[in-house]
Curated annotation (Swiss-Prot):
Species of the source: Clostridioides difficile (strain 630)
Function field: IGPS catalyzes the conversion of PRFAR and glutamine to IGP, AICAR and glutamate. The HisF subunit catalyzes the cyclization activity that produces IGP and AICAR from PRFAR using the ammonia provided by the HisH subunit.
Active site: D11, D130
Highest taxon listed in the record's lineage: Bacteria
Keywords from the named record: Amino-acid biosynthesis, Cytoplasm, Histidine biosynthesis, Lyase
Listed name of the protein: Imidazole glycerol phosphate synthase subunit HisF
Subunit: Heterodimer of HisH and HisF.
């Protein structure tokens, strides 16, 4: 049975972890290294750090926090935001990250996925997709931290990303982000049925049952959340025990 991963997501702005709703209403939480160590000690399987203003400000990821995180935790972690070329992958991986996430830059230059996969291995390349549902029922891809709509269909883009060499897909529902109403099961199910790499659910966790539903109904490999962890609403150990009791294989 596949072991599912519980992954806290830490959005970083100006060297601090922050959290908002639907990419707005930003609240300060803590420093990346302190919160990262806390989650590492509490049983998280992996961490994801996004420098959420790097792409919109057209700058590189802040590497200072990457070094500090690597020195403080003992679980894998992924870093994204402002990754535009192979050298950015090299810099982030050398600072201690295990994976690099690309979003806006991959839309602008899809070949970056292939180039990075060939140089560093598909396991290091994570395609992050910010998706928002349209009135007719499809999902559009957004870039620059959710600020700019593209003409890409989110499901088609996920499939294309895997074809190019992405080793993992993070699917973030902008409609559900920070709303705590549950994950976008419909979108996740469509993507997991079409790709053969791990898919991570993001956006919408509000209670333990939402995590179970994401695994049970959409067959995702990992479940990512932010505010329910940051503000102590759900404890990772409690969540894992609940999932285990529900028949989900997790690492305790």
């Amino acid at each position: 049975m596949l072991t599912r991963r519980i992954i806290p997501c830490l959005d970083v702005r100006n060297g601090r972890v922050v959290k908002g709703k639907k990419f707005k209403d930003i609240v300060d939480v803590d420093s990346p290294e302190v919160l990262g160590k806390f989650y590492s000690d509490c049983g998280a399987d992996e961490l994801v750090f996004y420098d959420i203003t790097a792409s919109n400000e057209e700058r590189k990821t802040s590497l200072e926090f990457v070094t500090k995180v690597a020195e403080n935790i003992n679980i894998p972690f992924c870093v994204g935001g402002g990754v535009n070329k192979l050298e950015d992958f090299t810099d982030i991986l050398r600072k201690g990250a295990d994976k690099v996430s690309i979003n806006s830059s991959a839309v602008k230059n899809p070949e970056l996925i292939r180039e990075a996969s060939l140089k560093f291995g598909a396991q290091c390349v994570v395609l992050s997709i910010d998706a928002k549902k349209n009135e007719e029922g499809s999902w559009s891809v957004y870039v620059k931290g959710g600020r700019e709509k593209t003409n890409l269909d989110a499901i088609e883009w996920a499939v294309k990303g895997v074809e190019l060499g992405a080793g993992e897909i993070v699917v973030n529902s902008m409609d559900e982000d920070g709303m705590k109403n549950g994950y976008d099961i419909e979108l996740l199910s469509k993507i997991t049925s079409l790709v053969n790499v791990p898919v991570i659910a993001s956006g919408g966790a509000g209670k333990k049952e939402d995590f179970y539903e994401a695994v049970n109904k959409s067959n995702v490999d990992g479940i990512l959340a932010a505010s329910v962890f940051h503000f102590g609403e759900i404890k990772i150990n409690d969540l894992k025990k609940y999932l285990k009791d529900m028949g989900v294989e997790v690492r305790l």
